[in-house]
């Protein structure tokens, strides 16, 4: 059973896979339009829900709670829980405010990064997760992209983290991953989202 302390640790990190055998660092110029269209669609996707599991590893500690994430524009609601609903944790946020509730414990801060810094003493790019989970590098930030032979983005490096996308599925014409690995060698840090089931707006499809 996942303890409440472990789930609190996992939830803090949240407020922060092998690649295809045939890959290239960048597609030819005349094929860039495929990724350009996909990235534009992902940027416009600001309302979505997902369910799955997330394995959180940091400094040799590891936990795997279930996750339900509702995202509406820049506001989000993330629920984490373990076996038999143990350690039920709720994270809610919007620009300028974020809170975490677990039982009778309540924490709040101006940003998810600030909350992690207050509670754990770590600086992590948590605000990037809303982009990375969709398979989208944070716009206007340097990133090294890796594509497969279908010109699908399968991995990228950004802000000293490596993000690997796998089990790509079609959701009403939009490609989204069912697994996302986010890793950094420092502190042996890893977030592994698996079994993701996405629900998109009515003009998109729900896929599993």
Predicted regions, residues:
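Extended lipid/amphipathic-ligand handling interfaces
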Residues: 67-70, 91-93, 166-170
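Beta-strand-dominated lipid-handling architectures at cellular/organellar boundaries
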Residues: 49-51, 70, 75, 90-92, ...
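Flexible, processing/modification-adjacent segments and terminal tails
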Residues: 102-159
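Bacterial Sec signal peptide processing site at the extreme N-terminus
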Residues: 19-39
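Post-signal-peptide N-terminal segment of Sec-exported extracytoplasmic proteins
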Residues: 41-77
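Sec-dependent bacterial lipoprotein signal peptides
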Residues: 1-22
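An acidic-aromatic
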Residues: 75-123
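Gly/Pro-enriched, hydrophobic low-complexity segments
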Residues: 136-208
């Amino acid at each position: 059973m996942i303890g409440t302390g472990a789930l609190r640790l996992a939830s803090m990190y949240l407020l922060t896979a092998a690649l295809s055998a045939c890959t290239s660092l960048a597609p030819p110029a005349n094929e860039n339009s495929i990724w350009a269209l996909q990235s534009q669609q992902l940027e416009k996707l600001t309302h979505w829900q997902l369910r799955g599991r997330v394995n959180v590893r940091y400094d040799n500690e590891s936990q795997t709670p279930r996750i339900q994430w509702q995202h509406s524009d820049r506001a989000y609601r993330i629920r984490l829980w373990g076996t038999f609903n143990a350690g039920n944790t709720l994270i809610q946020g919007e620009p300028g405010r974020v809170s975490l509730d677990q039982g009778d414990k309540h924490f709040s801060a101006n940003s998810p990064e600030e909350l992690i810094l207050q509670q754990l003493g770590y600086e992590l790019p948590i605000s990037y997760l809303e982009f990375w989970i969709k398979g989208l590098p944070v716009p206007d930030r340097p990133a090294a992209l890796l594509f497969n032979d279908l010109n699908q983005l399968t991995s990228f490096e950004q802000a000293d983290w490596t993000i690997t996308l796998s089990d790509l599925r079609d959701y009403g014409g939009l490609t989204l991953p069912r697994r996302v690995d986010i890793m950094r060698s420092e502190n042996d840090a890893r977030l592994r989202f698996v079994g993701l089931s996405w629900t998109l707006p009515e003009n998109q499809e729900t896929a599993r």
